[in-house]
Amino acid sequence: MSYKGNDIEKQQSASTATGFNDKQIASTSEDATDRSHNIHGDTSSLDSRYTYETVDQEKNYFKRVYNSFKPMNLEEQGIDTSQLTPVERTIIASAKHPLARRLKARHLQMIAIGGSIGTGLFVGSGYALANGGPGAVLIGYVIVGYALLTVVNALGELSVQFPVSGSFNAFFSRFLEPSFGGTFGILYAASWCISLPSELIAAAMTIQYWNTEVNPAVWVAVFWVVIVVINLFGVKGYGEMEYFLSIIKVLAVVGFIILGICITCGVGDQGYIGGKYWHNPGAFNHGLKGVTSVFISAAFSFGGIELVALAASETANPRISLPAAVKSTFWRIFIFYILTAIIIGCLVPYTNDDLLNGTGIAASPFVIAVSQGGIRVVPHIMNAVVVIAVISVGNSSVYGCSRTLASLAVQGLLPKSMGYIDRGGRPLIAILFTSAIGLLGFLVVVDNEGDVFTWFFSICSLSSFFTWGAINVVHLRWRFALAAQGRSTDEIIFRSPLGTFGSWTGILVLILIVIGEVWVSIWPIGSPADVQQFWKNCLSLPLMIVMWAGFKTYHRSWNMLWVKLEDIDLDTGRREIDVELLKQELAEERQIIKSKPFVYRIYKFFF
């Protein structure tokens, strides 16, 4: 544009100097303009082209967004399951399921570290303390924590080897039998599905700590929209949100631990506390039943710790990022649960009135502990952290349920439409289905919504223990299948540090936990045998059996209880196809680690 103006000015000054008339000047100006157009282009056309290009870019952007919701053609992925057996179809379909691989190592690390921190820890630990006392809470968290440690390590070994859609849900079908995959998968999806509306209600009730004038249904709607929008951004949206929310939750727990140690040692209105509440009123409440009653609360607190494996199929390089996330399990269990349980037991007696009679955030031992220490602003901070935790768990609920439902659908265990994957790698129908269940959160306006959700949760009350136990069984069958087919453990990319011993002991611990829960459900604490209480706590047990039998009958597979070890597919779904090359690379990596100093080897074992 400046070029054209300069040319015209030069021509006009030249014409004036030589005595040209106005027509000649105009003609010269037009010629100059034409030459300028020829040399530098017509600026008006440039402007118009720029406008058109901008409009086209905007149209293309919205078109790309629109097209991203169209289905991913599985035939383009090379999937033809028409001539395959149910087991073969399950294995191949889950291996080639086109979920987007957009999670990075930092996402996986924070999902592993802080993804399971939620209302189970911040509020549920209070119920455990009231029923069992500080000693029972510590024992219960240690026992369930050990069981989870074996599960996550076993699952890490399997997920690094086979980063397939659905993770452990697909492993149930591959290493056990598709009916087990359908049963455990639906129970697992149901637990997340029911968690979403309950977390929405928890968020609305938590907000009422500050404002009781706004109808809680309004807050349910707000949080529902936020969670749904996050998940419609795909796995990258889920990963980024969990990354930042987990950082906040981790900082909050670490801050509480530091503050709790200070209050215990005498910083606060109460002076030195130490372990006096372990002596008066005592370490245990209700004896062995009190210890057993902690298991369900502990399972609720630990729930979601396995999500890191579910995310493996959507991770760019699970071979590198997943082992590091799995190894951190020991530290997060110890720091965020065991250490927190010890501090809570030191700061809050199980006879505390707020603990026994409070509701919501008021019954949180975190809030009670700092309030008794004379720090008045911290309850508001913890309340905000609980809101963040609720959003995080709601976000994970949609993610966990939708991925599980989509995996079941692609395996042929649910209607095909549930496995709809759009071009953005989102299981769209499964996300919308899970989000629709979240609308049950509007039951917050009903007077007896607590009873409704008690029965909802009874569907999946023990399902976490069944799922975790089945993961350990799958790990054992994976190792047994390697031996039965003459394969070496040298081809295992990441070996569970606890090995098969961990899986065996984990199964034993989980069986004892389930037996204890059935006992406490039949004969509740402080009351005679109660049939209704039993069904509230153990409905998932007969439901699991009926569901498994239904799958066996529908698929007419009663002639096969297990997939034979010799018939288990040990290759489909690997990202490293050349087994011999893989074994060579792994041997070199292990040799490098062996050559390092002892301190480094210890570091690599734990991190």
From Swiss-Prot:
Segments for region (Disordered): 1-45
Residues glycosylated per entry: N357, N395
Start-end of Polar residues biased regions: 11-30
Induction: Expression is under control of the CSY1 amino-acid sensor. Expression is also regulated by HAP43, GCN2, GCN4 and SSN6. Induced during biofilm development.
Gene3D superfamilies: Amino acid/polyamine transporter I
Membrane-protein topology: Multi-pass membrane protein
Coiled coil: none
TM ranges: 110-130, 132-152, 184-204, 214-234, 243-263, 291-311, 330-350, 373-393, 427-447, 452-472, 506-526, 531-551
Keywords: Amino-acid transport, Cell membrane, Glycoprotein, Membrane, Transmembrane, Transmembrane helix, Transport
Taxonomic superkingdom: Eukaryota
InterPro entries assigned: AA-permease/SLC12A_dom, Amino_acid_permease_CS, Amino_acid_permease_fungi, APC_YAT
Chief subcellular location: membrane
Swiss-Prot/TrEMBL GO biological process terms: amino acid transmembrane transport; S-adenosyl-L-methionine transport
Cysteine-cysteine disulfides: none
GO cellular component: extracellular vesicle; membrane; plasma membrane
Keyword RNA-binding carried by entry: no
Listed NCBIfam families: 2A0310
Similarity field: Belongs to the amino acid-polyamine-organocation (APC) superfamily. YAT (TC 2.A.3.10) family.
Function: Amino-acid permease involved in S-adenosylmethionine (SAM) transport and required for SAM-induced morphogenesis. GAP4 is also able to transport arginine and thialysine, and thus probably also lysine.
Entry protein name: S-adenosylmethionine permease GAP4
Origin species: Candida albicans (strain SC5314 / ATCC MYA-2876)
Gene: GAP4
